[in-house]
Swiss-Prot record:
GO terms for molecular function: ATP binding; proline-tRNA ligase activity. Consists of three domains: the N-terminal catalytic domain, the anticodon-binding domain and the C-terminal extension. The keyword Aminoacyl-tRNA synthetase applies. The keyword NADP does not apply. Keywords: Aminoacyl-tRNA synthetase, ATP-binding, Cytoplasm, Ligase, Nucleotide-binding, Protein biosynthesis. Homodimer. InterPro entries: aa-tRNA-synt_IIb, aa-tRNA-synth_II, aa-tRNA-synth_II/BPL/LPL, Anticodon-bd, Anticodon-bd_dom_sf, Pro-tRNA-ligase_IIa_arc-type, Pro-tRNA_ligase_II_C, Pro-tRNA_synth_II. This is Proline--tRNA ligase. Catalyzes the attachment of proline to tRNA(Pro) in a two-step reaction: proline is first activated by ATP to form Pro-AMP and then transferred to the acceptor end of tRNA(Pro). The gene is proS. PROSITE patterns: AA_TRNA_LIGASE_II. One of its GO terms (biological process) is prolyl-tRNA aminoacylation. Its main location: cytoplasm. It comes from Bdellovibrio bacteriovorus (strain ATCC 15356 / DSM 50701 / NCIMB 9529 / HD100).
Length: 499
């Protein structure tokens, strides 16, 4: 029998380990459509918790929700040249509006559309079209809108949650009277994402600006939060874009200023997706399955009653129901502790391993002997599966929120220590090549490099399969020359292999 619940382990085959964690935790599965996944109830419950927190944070910063069409006229994308060029290869196109029988029991497309429709890869163009109708005067500004929806981008190499053809996300779109307001909005939402990643996902991130070659198509500036996974590859976890007046001009978003002058507006967009669940898995999970930070866990505590006969069953169930009630009366991060009693007709060990693989933070086993002593037997997901301890029942209830927060903080600190130990300052091309030359499936972490725009697109990057992740916002002065061009460096840039 394997020593761990997941095979292969992280050290044996990290990409396959990742897929097996998703299967073992019963989070998602592949669908009949290539590149599209089924998000199962446990995985979707994590997404719902993410949605709930983010939605509140958006509303606390003045945003409201709306919904815009899935289908976008091709001509809308063509209005913004850089935008359409950036997404052209990923677009799914609808060309017909009905089906008909071919006489042999098969269905074929019929009724060709006058203009092809694009299944949204992102919604700047169609939302911009609507904003142009909504904005007449400076009094109509700002517009601060978010939508929760699905998007479609054909992907050749798919991986559940991390990179799928269809995925769920939120996209925020805002319109402002001045560049300054739009830039402030862009950074405000970057900070919202950073706060969410660190305080709820327990995933440390680096806030930064993308280099020009990595910007969102059509953006003036793209800001990002970058995380480092356990295999030392980077993950772009969220982006916020200052679009300048590019999309406003393409969509004719104009307003009459207080001085009576017609002006083009300034816009932003920002988004995160179900890719965050992939980041959550790869930041915290271990060789026994998913590890989910308590603040996002669908369940905080699972109670497993242990008994040998009907008489013991009745007594233990009464005891654990009272325990469940007392635990639910405790408040953790603004809501009741989420508790479940698992009374299925299964061995206790089987149940425990299911919840270990699903990442439930706290497992509680209660049998007649525990009940007689007024105790509970507690296991924590951030420790080994055999590390369990008896606790006095009332003390456990009183301490549950502290225990959950201790686990949350511990997961963050562990991930931060790993990240911080995996950033290396490199000031010459030879050391850079050596740092990243371990092969396609090995990554050392972040390389912090002196850089200038003349060094963009260096041929060595493609050979090493390394990309610039960001120019960190927290920059110390850079000295010396860009390692790629030899010209004076202007910024420190983080490079890494990435997802």
């Amino acid at each position: 029998m394997a020593d761990t619940a997941i095979t292969p382990t992280r050290s044996q085959n990290y990409p396959e380990w990742y897929q097996q964690v998703i299967v073992a935790a019963d989070m998602a599965e592949n669908s009949p459509v290539r590149g599209c996944m089924v998000i199962k109830p446990w995985g979707y419950a994590v997404w719902e918790n993410m949605q709930g927190v983010l939605d509140r944070m958006f509303k606390d910063t003045g945003h409201v929700n709306a919904y815009f069409p899935l289908l976008i006229p091709l001509s809308f994308l063509e209005k913004e040249a850089a935008h359409v060029e950036g997404f052209a290869k990923e677009c799914a196109v609808v060309t017909h509006h009905r089906l008909k029988g071919d006489g042999n029991g098969k269905l074929i497309p019929d009724g060709e559309l006058e203009e092809p429709l694009i299944i949204r890869p992102t919604s700047e163009t169609i939302i911009g079209h609507q904003f142009a109708k909504w904005v007449k005067s400076y009094r109509d500004l700002p517009i601060l809108v978010n939508q929760w929806c699905n998007v479609m981008r054909w992907e050749m190499r798919t991986r559940m949650f991390l990179r799928t053809a269809e995925f769920l996300w939120q996209e925020g779109h805002t319109v402002h009277a001045t560049a300054k307001e739009a830039q402030e909005e862009t950074l405000q939402m970057l900070n919202v994402y950073s706060e969410f990643a660190e305080q709820y996902m327990a995933m440390p991130v680096i806030k930064g600006m993308k280099t020009p070659d990595e910007r969102f198509p059509g953006a003036v500036d793209t800001y990002t939060i970058e995380a480092l996974m356990q295999d030392k590859k980077a993950l772009q976890a969220g982006t916020s874009h200052f679009l300048g007046q590019n999309f406003a001009k393409a969509s004719e978003i104009k307003y009459l200023s207080a001085e009576g002058k017609e002006e083009f507006a300034w816009t932003t967009s920002w988004g995160v997706s179900t890719r965050l669940i992939g980041g959550l898995i790869m930041t915290h999970s271990d060789d026994n399955g998913f590890v989910v930070p308590p603040r996002l866990a669908p369940l905080h505590v699972v109670i497993i009653p242990i008994y040998r006969n009907d008489e013991e069953r009745a007594q233990v169930l009464d005891y654990v129901k009272a325990l469940e009630k007392d635990l639910k009366a405790q408040n953790y991060v603004g809501s009741s502790v989420r508790v479940k009693i698992d009374d299925r007709d299964m061995r206790g060990g089987e149940k425990a391993w299911q919840y270990i693989k699903q990442g439930v933070p706290v497992r509680v086993e209660v049998g007649p002997r525990d009940m007689a002593k007024g105790e509970v037997f507690v296991g924590r997901r951030d420790r080994g599966p055999k590390e369990k301890a008896s606790m006095e029942r009332n003390a456990f209830v009183a301490n549950i929120t502290n225990l959950l927060q201790e686990m949350q903080d511990g997961l963050f600190e562990r991930a931060k220590q790993m990240r911080d130990e995996s950033i290396k300052t490199i000031t010459n091309l030879q050391d850079f090549e050596k740092y990243f030359s371990g092969g396609e499936n090995t990554a050392p972490g972040f390389a912090k490099v002196p850089w200038c725009e003349a060094g963009m697109g260096h041929e060595l990057l493609a050979q090493l399969k390394v990309t610039p992740r960001c120019m960190p916002l927290d920059q110390e002065p850079v000295q010396g020359n860009c390692i790629f061009s030899g010209k004076p460096a202007t910024k420190w840039v983080l490079f890494a292999k990435s997802y």
